[in-house]
Amino acid sequence: MITRIFILAISLCIFQATVAQPKVLYDVVLTGGRVIDPETKLDTIKNVGIINNRIAQISSEPLKGKEMINVAGLVVAPGFIDLHVHGRTNQEQEYQLHDGVTTALELEWGIEHLGKWYASRQGKALINYGASVNWPYERFKAINKYKDGVNKLYQTSIKGESTIEEMTNTILPAATEQLTAEEISKTHNNIKSALSEGGIGIGVPIGYLPKTNPKEMYAVFQLAGEMNALVFTHVRNPDIISIQEVIADAILTNAPLHIVHINSMSLGNIQLGLDMVSAAQQKGFKITTELYPYTAGSTSLQSAMFSDGWQERLGISYDGLQWVATGERLTKETFDVYRKTGGVVILHVMKPEWIKTGIAAPGVIIASDGMPYAKLAHPRTAGTFSRVLGKYVREDKVIDLMTAIEKMTLLPAKRLEDIAPMMRFKGRIQVGADADITIFNPNTIIDKATFEKGLEFSAGIEYVMVNGTFVLRKGKTVAAVYPGQPVYGKFKK
């Protein structure tokens, strides 16, 4: 309701301006497109007028613009919002852009030295960006004996050169540490400080620190509940008990919770995992989840996920692991070598029917878990949203177009509105909303990246506008344009 009031207020101001000036000249007019707004359920042919960074008019009547773009036969949708990415540079953002993404956020892990990172991206980003507080790193900082690792990461972070793989490998020695009460208190103070730098909630990837004491985990949720700070979590193990753990912690502390990639966290029990989330929602708890539309996951081979017993936990063996650097399937011998040297693997662990179940489930958000750039990186890095629209909407008819767009735009925007108020103006095609707009051909959109060929731009995304500026035109990236803006959490000072 508050969101609608904000947008209506801006709409009224724009309306009054257009009444006073009946011959309004818009900066850009999108003509004749199929306009879809998942909040109002608008799905019809309209013209869209844009002034500066806002949608100023949506009309069946002709509009006049400085630039007129004919989008007949194309869908005009809110820009896609990705809650779960790990790429930190424009190299990854360009693939996301060609997948229709206008806002890409690192919320599972978060980012260390948030203030420095936000500053390093200012005026340089293709699309909107933001991140949560990196709980593993703030925890790591609280342990005195790891000061050298803290300093190393600081130097790369302030240059904008740190990667999630470097960060995870640096903090790995602390993954098994049992924190004292004093260290837990320091961690919480670190979290509060990082939230004040703009962090969008708290990234708690407990699956990478699975030996963390449940008492320490519960304390993090208590802090989140007290502050009403959204927790994003990769659960302890890929099983139902781990999903129960975080839901229980969230319910007992009243902490808002988002469980990442439930498809790979619940594996063969995805319906039960979804039922648990739904039951919590029906009781009034702010708990949500997401998935990506692929049957394989991806992560660092040096992570705690591959500690003793990983085959039993994941239900695969060495040949279910694919080495990103070369595309080869692993053996025991190569596994042992690469586990020492470090790098990223793809885990072929899921079945197609599990993905369909998750995509069809009401309220489940689409998010990519896109990886840092490598030619053979997981294809979800480049094709998540186009794959949903091409395969699961057009080809397999698992969900309809309106529902798919809702899962990619309105649902992630609404999930973040409490923690990041600026998201109230995203995920919508409405007068007064931000002009983050993705325009695609519903008959041709499809992902092109594969496990074998590696990353490729998706097909069918024709235009992408970020904050009123075109970043993609006729399927081509616009050179030297960087309209992406930071998305900050509500605690920023």
How would you describe each model-predicted region?
Residues 68-70, 80, 129-131, 288, ...:
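Conserved beta-strand scaffold positions in the cores of enzyme catalytic domains, especially
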Residues 94-115, 126-137, 195-209, 226-236, ...:
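Divalent metal-dependent hydrolysis catalytic cores, especially in the metallo-beta-lactamase
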Residues 6, 17-46, 51, 60-61, ...:
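Active-site microenvironment of metallo-dependent hydrolases
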Residues 1-8:
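Sec-dependent signal peptide recognition
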Residues 145-217, 247-251, 256-401:
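Active-site neighborhoods of metal-dependent hydrolases
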Residues 61-124:
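Metal-associated gating/positioning segment near the N- to mid-region
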Residues 111-117, 210-220, 242-243:
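Active-site-adjacent beta->alpha loops and helix N-cap segments on the catalytic face
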